[in-house]
Amino acid sequence: MGTDELRAAAGLFARLLAADAIPWRGVLGGVRITEEDTTSSSRIFLKVMFQEMAEQLGVRVLGRRMNDDDESEVRDALFPGDNAENTRFAINFFTAIGLGGVTEPARRMLSLL
């Protein structure tokens, strides 16, 4: 899949997730944002998807949804707490794509690891 196709697919998922047309847990519950679990292509996909979701929902709402206790599977997958390196990678990923505001709970968790 080329970059244009990745962007189109990510945009579709962003719109569906932002509209709650598909379940966050079902889509994002298995997405671990770590160096080992992602590739450059998957990071492009995730970057576009989360940036478009932020445009549609706003960063605050997106952050609340990603870190919601009712969606703990999503939070725990996106911000793995198994070790500091994985947590830091996820925080750095979101910060690098301009969404550092969604990382505050993960930053607090990192200080406890």
Q: Language-model segments: what does each one mean?
A:
Residues 1-113:
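Eukaryotic alpha-helical solenoid repeat scaffolds
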